Curated annotation (Swiss-Prot):
The keyword Nucleus applies. This is Regulator of rDNA transcription 14. Keywords: Nucleus, Transcription, Transcription regulation. Its main location: nucleus. It is found in: Nucleus, Nucleolus. InterPro entries: Rrt14 (IPR031404). The keyword Magnesium does not apply. Belongs to the RRT14 family. One of its GO terms (cellular component) is nucleolus. Involved in ribosome biogenesis, probably through modulation of rDNA transcription. It comes from Debaryomyces hansenii (strain ATCC 36239 / CBS 767 / BCRC 21394 / JCM 1990 / NBRC 0083 / IGC 2968). It comes from the Eukaryota. The lineage of its organism: Eukaryota, Fungi, Dikarya, Ascomycota, Saccharomycotina.
Length: 195
């Protein structure tokens, strides 16, 4: 068989050698001399084949990245579902409150939500826009004022109750003040000392 160029001859030899190396166990593949005479398209094809064969480390890395992305998607979906459930619960409680059907558990939840919102308002960082900052400060003051008034009323009511209980116990004789007995002077003092 005659070849018109060295390139076509090397292509034919490479193809035959490749065929023999895959079929016969004792034959060797292409030598470095022959591989250098391969066309650029064949070299590119071989390079792409080698790139497609990933090492174990690369496979692990890709698997890890895919797992991380999947975990992130699941986490985001759970957060969205949790946020939706909270919002639905809030709207249900708000509806019950306007209807006057608020249960004790729902009232506790509202108190907890108010405390949480007050704390988050107290922790708000600095804001650059003065209009937004002034509006936010006004809202914060209104909420804190309402919360303080409720707290003050409750504290005053508790203190009044404690005072009434104490006075009623003293009047009944259940408890007594420590100190002087009525009509007696303290020990060690004379009647002549009038200071």
């Amino acid at each position: 068989m005659s070849f018109t160029s060295k390139t076509s001859k090397s292509h034919a030899e490479a193809t035959v050698n490749k065929l023999f190396s895959s079929l016969l166990p004792g034959t060797q593949g292409t030598t470095s001399k022959q591989s250098s005479s391969l066309s650029s398209a064949e070299l590119l094809s071989i390079e792409i084949e080698n790139k497609n064969k990933l090492s174990k480390e690369e496979l692990k890395k890709i698997h890890k990245q895919n797992k991380f992305k999947q975990h992130k998607k699941i986490k985001k979906a759970l957060e969205d579902e949790k946020r939706f459930n909270k919002l639905a619960k809030y709207h249900l409680i708000k509806h019950h409150k306007t209807g006057g059907e608020l249960s004790e558990e729902e009232a506790k939840y509202l108190k907890k939500l108010v405390k949480k919102n007050v704390n988050s308002l107290n922790r708000v960082s600095e804001i650059d826009d003065m209009e937004i900052k002034s509006e936010l400060d006004q809202v914060r003051q209104d909420i804190l004022k309402i919360n303080k008034e409720k707290h003050d009323k409750k504290a005053k009511r508790i203190q009044n109750k404690k005072t009434k209980d104490f006075n009623s116990k003293v009047a009944k004789g259940m408890i007594s003040y420590p100190g002087l007995t009525p009509g007696l002077a303290p020990v060690g003092l004379d009647d002549s000392d009038d200071e």
